[in-house]
Amino acid sequence: MNPIVKQFKYGQHTVTLETGAIARQATAAVMASMDDTSVFVTVVAKKDVKEGQDFFPLTVNYQERTYAAGRIPGGFFKREGRPSEGETLIARLIDRPIRPLFPEGFFNEIQIIATVVSVNPQISPDLVAMIGASAALSLSGVPFNGPIGAARVGFINDQFVLNPTMNEQKQSRLDLVVAGTDKAVLMVESEADILTEEQMLAAVVFGHQQQQIVIEAIKEFAAEAGKPRWDWTAPEANTILIEKVKSIAENRLGDAYRITEKQARYEQIDLIKADVITQVTAEDETISEGKIIDIFTALESQIVRGRILRGEPRIDGRTVDTVRALDICTGVLPRTHGSAIFTRGETQALAVATLGTERDAQIIDELTGEKTDHFLFHYNFPPYSVGETGMIGSPKRREIGHGRLAKRGVAAVMPSLSEFPYVVRVVSEITESNGSSSMASVCGASLALMDAGVPIKAAVAGIAMGLVKEEDNFVVLSDILGDEDHLGDMDFKVAGTREGVTALQMDIKIEGITAEIMQIALNQAKSARMHILGVMEQAIPAPRADISDFAPRIYTMKIDPKKIKDVIGKGGATVRSLTEETGTSIDIDDDGTVKIAAVDKNAVQEVMSRIEDITAEVEVGVVYKGKVTRLADFGAFVALVGNKEGLVHISQIAEERVEKVSDYLAIGQEVIVKVLEIDRQGRIRLTMKELAKDQTKNEENLLQSEEGSPVQE
């Protein structure tokens, strides 16, 4: 075996591409490494197309092996299971920029598998996987119009940083991944700490310029190690069939696309489609339904795109920069902690915020170890939202991706745990959908968080932009419909505050998207975002002053770290009895910070009082109220504060001589005692002598009524 290796410098890292030694039965296989992070990527492409295949079956799988980090998986089976949310998101990250680079009409099945086999904790494997997938496709010989490059851009001390390490990323105000060809950007995924539109665009341009090194290296690698290009040509257009479909459907489709209501429009389009299929197949039974539908869809695209480029009204009658009608309601669910319904045209999100304690935080078992997430965001897209029936179950890739985008949009304005000691979960239920439900989720989440009294730094709104481009003629669309997304050339989503951008996601289906077009889209998105924020601020101008009556109240107190074991008790018995008896939740940090959560304020005060008693120190000369726990011939043991116990010697029970302890004291009896001495071993000597004559008076002078409380002398 003589592997072929290509090595090049990429920013501060060294990238190595190797092929020819492993997985030689795959169509192509590449071991891509960036320093010590290695991802093994394979491509298998079928030479034959399944009969009746009318779509491109591309599958991208990304999987992390725990051995890559020198770990053994947890759980009973001790092996990796179904893909995690993080793995699903990275699979989407690989898929999005490569899918548009396969030619129209190419329906051969392709599977890409990226396996993380070694990981340096400072270098994320996602970028390495993208580079490896691009290289493997370039070697495979399939009709792939790549290669693509990929770059991560950080923003530290007002400077762009190429492929920052994990430690550098913690100081960065930006996490942006950009992928594209040598000519154009194809995909952007980012999260930002409220940067300007100009800074975001500059980051995209910077990343695209830097990744040219990767593209050139992969071209050289493919020239040396690549397989012969497949002899594939796109099937010739059936002009007779195209004209036939056009003659039946064009005018009727034109009228249908003037129906502004989505369901009514779809019903009319379905009728036209069924009529076309019936008429065409009646004349020639050999023509497949799939081919007719492809031509029908292309005709729909021509009609919609042509109208937009000619400056005619859009499908729903709007101009290119008009945002659909907005409707906002907050506090819609009485027993939840915060809720809002955000409606934009025919897209609607019900967002609900829930506050929890630190024990509600999500523990994520990542490749390099466990991570705790205190802000959870879940996006649900039920079939009824588009008027369909379907399966209900675990979230699909799309739901996971949309939820993460919405979370990125809101994360920058969330308070820190020290500012607001709650774990926060937001759920966005999409109840209607006709374009940009993820951005509706951002708006709904912002409203629900404010309704819940979460002190977010500013309101956040999101907007989806579209593009229709033919040669040098282009139109940027604000607040796109589902059809405009499907038939357009770009899906460009921007979330942010009045001050700047918090998240940017871009997927482009064509080449030739210039920085000028992106700048126009960003400016138009800013204008739309300001309009939406204005309406949101009218509904709820600031976070509620107080949290919901149904949300847990979290109170904090400090104890001596040495006393933590006393509060917890043997095997957790003490803290468990506190929580069970009061209905509270108690979390104790190593520094002695105690967080007590409960809906009932009185329960919290009771717990705080009991913890103060448990952790209190017994002092010499102080008088306490205690309870007799044991009797002995030589005296009585009395429970004091802080789980401490002292001895009242028989000679210290009364002024007169005591012959028998049980004549004066009984187990469970409350008594007033004074601390005489605490010896080196911590043993406490008590006396009742001076206090025995006037126990009643001392009881009236109690500072606190609880067992073990000190009293005034």
UniProtKB/Swiss-Prot annotation:
It is found in: Cytoplasm. Residues 701-713 have a biased composition (Polar residues). Residues 694-713 are annotated as: Disordered. PROSITE patterns: KH_TYPE_1, S1. Residues 621-689 form the S1 motif domain. GO terms for biological process: mRNA catabolic process; RNA processing. Its EC number is 2.7.7.8. Its cofactor is Mg(2+). It catalyses: RNA(n+1) + phosphate = RNA(n) + a ribonucleoside 5'-diphosphate. Mg(2+) binds at residues 485, 491. The keyword Cell membrane does not apply. GO terms for cellular component: cytosol. Keywords: Cytoplasm, Magnesium, Metal-binding, Nucleotidyltransferase, RNA-binding, Transferase. Residues 552-611 form the KH domain. It comes from the Bacteria. Component of the RNA degradosome, which is a multiprotein complex involved in RNA processing and mRNA degradation. NCBIfam families: polynuc_phos, PRK11824.1. PANTHER family: POLYRIBONUCLEOTIDE NUCLEOTIDYLTRANSFERASE (PTHR11252), POLYRIBONUCLEOTIDE NUCLEOTIDYLTRANSFERASE 1, MITOCHONDRIAL (PTHR11252:SF0). This is Polyribonucleotide nucleotidyltransferase.
